[in-house]
Amino acid sequence: MLPRLICINDYEQHAKSVLPKSIYDYYRSGANDEETLADNIAAFSRWKLYPRMLRNVAETDLSTSVLGQRVSMPICVGATAMQRMAHVDGELATVRACQSLGTGMMLSSWATSSIEEVAEAGPEALRWLQLYIYKDREVTKKLVRQAEKMGYKAIFVTVDTPYLGNRLDDVRNRFKLPPQLRMKNFETSTLSFSPEENFGDDSGLAAYVAKAIDPSISWEDIKWLRRLTSLPIVAKGILRGDDAREAVKHGLNGILVSNHGARQLDGVPATIDVLPEIVEAVEGKVEVFLDGGVRKGTDVLKALALGAKAVFVGRPIVWGLAFQGEKGVQDVLEILKEEFRLAMALSGCQNVKVIDKTLVRKNPLAVSKI
């Protein structure tokens, strides 16, 4: 009999008990000493809610839009690689859950299901593609063309990964894909991270990135990508106001404030703490989103109050997959949705339009752990 899980932490604890250690460690871990990993979550507690009273919250409307597309709630699924390690259906289960709830899914380029397979599994789902810039630009171009062909609505280009962060658990575990899996969007065994290939004795993924991803990428490559497609493009991994302004200058359509789940450079700020700087920098010219550390409905409310249009969740989704596949993902999203609805109501917000910065203040006594 399956246990009763009622919050995101419950799902993680269950996943830890059922997933192979190397797979759980891959999903859970951050870079180096994991200071930023802890701070991504802890930082939300430094921001306190100041609710409004007597605002008639008998009915609440959670719906909003992301890059012009309607979603049932400002909680979307972020790019999480290789989801079939958590459940046999992987990304297909995730997109079906998103379709059921009316929210969006960002598909990782490193998915264990292809762009086409995910589109076929969730034909009515709002889908976006996360993109890396490969040394072979034709590989990148092909991914973009596949996304366009299959009805994906935007490209989220990752800008924080010229090399892979130093993830100690992956080094200790000599992380590789299980033998039956590969990255399905690539044809060659090297690009598909096939277990048949030799990726060394440390983190296989770090070796993969060193072989395949271009560390020389610059704003010139963003210009190239902007010319390549008419789809909206969002810069994923921005943590500075000047970089955000540069992204706007280069014609990008959004900023995803992200530290890659604290998996790249340890010691960077929690995303919720830098969100106000990014929002101020773009001056309303593009939409701003956030990922990193979102585990509760109050986290969503705080992010929106500080200017995010929506948040993206990653690890909670794979914990849901590990529990019960599509139903597990749906349950995780339903929990976050209901927690967010309750937080809105208890803060006097009938809809997301009335959520603003007057709802939150940073605790003056709080000190970052970094």
Swiss-Prot record:
Binding site for FMN: 79-81, 108, 130, 158, 236, 258, 291-295, 314-315
MF (Gene Ontology): (S)-2-hydroxy-acid oxidase activity; FMN binding; glyoxylate oxidase activity
Pathway: Amino-acid biosynthesis; glycine biosynthesis
Compartment(s) where it occurs, according to its Swiss-Prot or TrEMBL record: Peroxisome matrix
Superkingdom field: Eukaryota
Pfam families to which the protein is assigned, alphabetical: FMN_dh
N6-succinyllysine: residues carrying this PTM: 184
Predominant cellular place of this UniProt entry's protein: other
Catalytic site: 260 (proton acceptor)
Record's GO cellular component terms: cytosol; intracellular membrane-bounded organelle; peroxisomal matrix
Modification sites for Phosphoserine: 194, 230
Cysteine-cysteine disulfides: none
CDD domains: alpha_hydroxyacid_oxid_FMN
EC number: 1.1.3.15, 1.2.3.5
Every FMN hydroxy acid dehydrogenase domain range: 1-365
Tissue specificity note: Highly expressed in liver.
Keyword Nuclease: no
Binding residue positions for glyoxylate: 26, 132, 167, 260, 263
The keyword Flavoprotein belongs to this UniProt entry's keyword annotation: yes
Motif residue range(s): Microbody targeting signal: 368-370
BP terms from Gene Ontology: fatty acid alpha-oxidation; glycine biosynthetic process; glycolate catabolic process; response to oxidative stress
Necessary cofactors: FMN
Functional note: Broad substrate specificity (S)-2-hydroxy-acid oxidase that preferentially oxidizes glycolate. The glyoxylate produced by the oxidation of glycolate can then be utilized by alanine-glyoxylate aminotransferase for the peroxisomal synthesis of glycine; this pathway appears to be an important step for the detoxification of glyoxylate which, if allowed to accumulate, may be metabolized to oxalate with formation of kidney stones.
Family in the record: Belongs to the FMN-dependent alpha-hydroxy acid dehydrogenase family.
Assembly description: Homotetramer.
Protein name per UniProt: 2-Hydroxyacid oxidase 1
Naturally occurring in which organism (per UniProt): Homo sapiens (Human)
